[in-house]
């Protein structure tokens, strides 16, 4: 089945006796649950209420993702940080698309994962102005929830793709591993919507993060990308155009891909990716701008 959810496309392929309408209704129910919990674009969501300090009680979805985010905050020495929302808003990548240069120093005073804590299922903030953005992990997490729903129905062969974040189990209709295409980034000289690499994933998940679609040019002619370094408050300047990660869960792959983009080419993304492959088994496929073209750094099996 194919359709739309979470503001993007959704594609599910599986071998099952359940009707497409049944599968679709289950996905839409999950979509509604995720939006009600974690959306920063729905003003009625629980996370939006928490960001406005109207409540502090967390549901299980928020607890899981906020705790998982701490792992990536630590791995990246703070480059990945879900409290980055005030900065992304200030740079024009939130609901308010104002592109005026913000007062970074004043905002940094209340940005930082170390300024929040979970106590008795409640979010405790050191500063009431701190706000959370889970967009870097929520879509991958939703893919996992959909996959787990399919597995609860006894479905063992499936692929779930929501906006390019993918989870797959078993084999396709031909009895082969699921094949997933990695998009070629568009960066001036490159063709849009072309496939750079097709890889197979064996009972895992894949996510890609990139800076080649969401950016703008400010009044000074500077390229401002949507990836903001929460440690400096400024847009990440990097030759790393996209980072694809294969991991056991899509939430992990989603957060890891964002983490590597936040670190960038100068911040040790490649070195950390190699370490994560060695210690955690994650695979990576990085595409860098390189003069008139691009270059690839990736796990050995993708070469």
Give the label of every model feature segment:
Residues 1-303:
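Mature catalytic core of soluble alpha/beta enzymes
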């Amino acid at each position: 089945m194919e359709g739309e959810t979470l503001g993007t496309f959704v594609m599910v392929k599986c071998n099952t006796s359940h009707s497409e309408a049944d599968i679709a209704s289950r996905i839409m129910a999950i979509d509604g649950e995720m939006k009600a919990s974690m959306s920063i674009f729905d003003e009625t969501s629980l996370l939006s209420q928490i960001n406005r300090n109207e409540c502090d009680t967390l549901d299980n979805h928020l607890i899981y993702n906020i705790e998982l985010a701490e792992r990536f905050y630590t791995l990246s020495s703070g480059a990945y940080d879900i409290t980055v929302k005030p900065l992304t808003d200030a740079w024009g990548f939130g609901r308010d698309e104002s592109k005026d240069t913000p007062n970074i120093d004043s905002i940094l005073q209340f940005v930082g994962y170390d300024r929040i804590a979970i106590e008795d299922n409640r979010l405790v903030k050191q500063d009431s102005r701190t706000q959370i953005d889970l967009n870097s992990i929520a879509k991958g997490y939703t893919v996992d929830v959909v996959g787990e729903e399919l597995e609860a129905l006894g479905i063992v062969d499936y692929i779930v793709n929501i906006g390019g974040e993918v989870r797959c189990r078993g084999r396709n209709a031909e009895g082969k591993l699921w094949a997933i295409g990695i998009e070629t980034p568009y960066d001036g000289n490159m063709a849009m919507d072309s496939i750079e690499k097709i890889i197979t994933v064996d009972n895992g998940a894949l996510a890609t993060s990139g800076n080649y679609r969401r950016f703008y040019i400010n009044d000074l002619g500077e390229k401002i990308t949507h990836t903001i370094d929460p440690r400096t408050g400024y847009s990440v300047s990097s030759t790393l155009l996209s980072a694809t990660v294969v991991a056991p869960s899509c939430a992990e792959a989603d957060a890891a891909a964002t983490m590597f983009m936040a670190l960038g080419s100068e911040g040790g993304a490649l070195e950390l990716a190699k370490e994560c492959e060695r210690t955690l088994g994650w695979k990576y496929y990085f595409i860098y701008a390189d003069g008139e073209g691009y270059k690839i750094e990736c796990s050995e099996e993708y070469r």
